[in-house]
Amino acid sequence: MYISDLQYSSPAMFTTELQRKVYEVLEILKIPFVRVSTDAAISMSDCKLIDEKLDMQMVKTLFLTNAQKSRFYLFVTCGQKAFDSKAFSQALGCSRVSFAPTGFMKEKMGVTVGAATVFSKLLDDVDAVQVVLDKDVVSNPWYGCSDGTTTGYMKLRTLDVVETFLNHIKHVPKVITV
């Protein structure tokens, strides 16, 4: 798998509108990051080499919905954790959830499978998606995620994501223990 050298600035060209917005907001908020460009990485196993290059653990970002497909959640957990729908639902106090259909992911978050990111909230003008953070992610000093593509990954301080970015977009995440 191709992984670029570490880079400390935005890409020269953007492949999606979301990717452009991600780097714009990082610049506006003065949030430092280090990033790499890669071949397409879809699964968590694809991310292992990226983790090594960035010296951190990539988060796993899951797009979930209830049975009626009327509530949507962006669940950010540790990359190595298995997802337990029952434990998630109990911790959040909601009905059982499942993975949202990919069409909803594109419609609500502006991304395809493998590119889900907390930064997708930049496209969620109607606040249709609730960000849910695993307490273990919040307690980690580093946050590794996609830049809204399957070929761009970055490392930032978790506090910059949870406090600075989410406060900037006026979204209050729910933090749960699973």
Q: What is the predicted function of each stretch?
A:
Residues 1-178:
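Extended, low-hydrophobicity, polar/charged segments
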